[in-house]
Amino acid sequence: MSIILGIDPGSRVTGYGVVRQVGHKLEYLGSGVIRTSIDDLPTRLKRIYAGITEIITQFNPNEFAIEQVFMAKNPDSALKLGQARGTAIVAAVNQNLPVFEYSPRTIKQTVVGTGAAEKSQVQEMVVRLLQLSDKPQVDAADALAIAITHANSIHNSLQIANSIAIKTPDKITALLRTKYRRGRLRLKG
């Protein structure tokens, strides 16, 4: 069983989504947004850090997944997004959580089936996959999609590791030597 915290970073609105993975099944635990005021950037980053730390304390996740930075048209926006993302990662690392990163295209591909999906399509698929009665806010839905992507990545990686261990009995411990980096499976040895 894993509890996964997904984060959709933003300097004004940061989405979060928490799911529990038991085998092949995902269970919705919670989601929402951390809104910051129009204060200066350091104050907003402080609020993001405090909010994520509070969420980690409340849900006690085992793993932390976050969206990678994409190239924005406005360089200033990209820098602020990167700072918000860094703040979120520091909050997770300070709570000893492993951090996994996924590109926006990978998240859309995993949840919707196409890397060019619209936000509304992601939101609708999150509702279906987690059997939610109401649509979450867009940023919260994105965060849940990130958590779903990570859960899917874990499941697929463990299947691959099991396959390797079965096909090579002399390396049966391959599963135990599995390491994840940036959401990708790496085998040591």
Curated annotation (Swiss-Prot):
Keywords: Cytoplasm, DNA damage, DNA recombination, DNA repair, DNA-binding, Endonuclease, Hydrolase, Magnesium, Metal-binding, Nuclease. Its EC number is 3.1.21.10. The active site is at D8, E67, D139. Its cofactor is Mg(2+). It is found in: Cytoplasm. Mg(2+) 1 binds at D8, D139. Its main location: cytoplasm. The keyword Cytoplasm applies. Mg(2+) 2 binds at E67. GO terms for molecular function: crossover junction DNA endonuclease activity; DNA binding; magnesium ion binding. InterPro entries: RNaseH-like_sf, RNaseH_sf, X-over_junc_endoDNase_Mg_BS, X-over_junc_endoDNase_RuvC. Binds 2 Mg(2+) ion per subunit. Homodimer which binds Holliday junction (HJ) DNA. The HJ becomes 2-fold symmetrical on binding to RuvC with unstacked arms; it has a different conformation from HJ DNA in complex with RuvA. In the full resolvosome a probable DNA-RuvA(4)-RuvB(12)-RuvC(2) complex forms which resolves the HJ. Belongs to the RuvC family. NCBIfam families: ruvC (TIGR00228). PANTHER family: CROSSOVER JUNCTION ENDODEOXYRIBONUCLEASE RUVC. This is Crossover junction endodeoxyribonuclease RuvC. It comes from Histophilus somni (strain 129Pt). The lineage of its organism: Bacteria, Pseudomonadati, Pseudomonadota, Gammaproteobacteria, Pasteurellales. The gene is ruvC.
